[in-house]
């Protein structure tokens, strides 16, 4: 059985026996923005993506569940929507050919910033990056 069927995609708490969330009332029929990842997408064969929490010009943040660590976390996706778009079938980002150099430069900066943040584990008020990987022609950072 798919482990995501037991989890609410709004808060990543276990669903009740009636398959409803008694914590946040999220339902699977809530639409998501097509340019971003759909709930129940699995990243790196490890992280179940839930609803999108926020997005800006740099990317999007999603609540997610770590199937290995068995904990909730946040996935941050590099997705500058003015430079690329998502292929709806493959989930890969397709970069506008005129923007390829800019896309790669900004993605490198995104990765560099998150590498620095991952070394700041001792600071209480900074979300710690616990994992970073490339998939779908972009970079993802998992925050604790």
Label each region the model flagged.
Residues 15, 23-35:
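Short Cys/His-rich micro-motifs in 6-15 aa windows
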Residues 30-49:
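A short, low-complexity linker immediately N-terminal to eukaryotic Hanks-type protein kinase catalytic domains
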């Amino acid at each position: 059985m798919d482990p995501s069927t037991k989890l609410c995609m709004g808060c990543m708490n276990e669903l009740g026996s009636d398959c409803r969330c008694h914590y946040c009332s999220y339902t699977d029929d809530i639409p998501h923005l097509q340019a971003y990842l759909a709930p129940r997408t699995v990243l790196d064969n490890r992280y179940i993506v839930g609803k999108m929490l926020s997005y800006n010009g740099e990317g999007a943040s999603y609540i997610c569940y770590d199937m290995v660590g068995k904990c909730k976390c946040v996935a941050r996706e590099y997705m500058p929507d003015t430079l690329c778009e998502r292929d709806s079938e493959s989930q890969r980002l397709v970069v506008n050919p005129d923007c390829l150099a800019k896309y790669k430069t900004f993605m490198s900066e995104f990765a560099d910033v998150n590498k620095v943040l991952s070394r700041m584990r001792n600071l209480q008020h900074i979300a710690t990056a616990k994992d970073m990987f490339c998939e779908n022609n972009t970079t993802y950072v998992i925050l604790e």
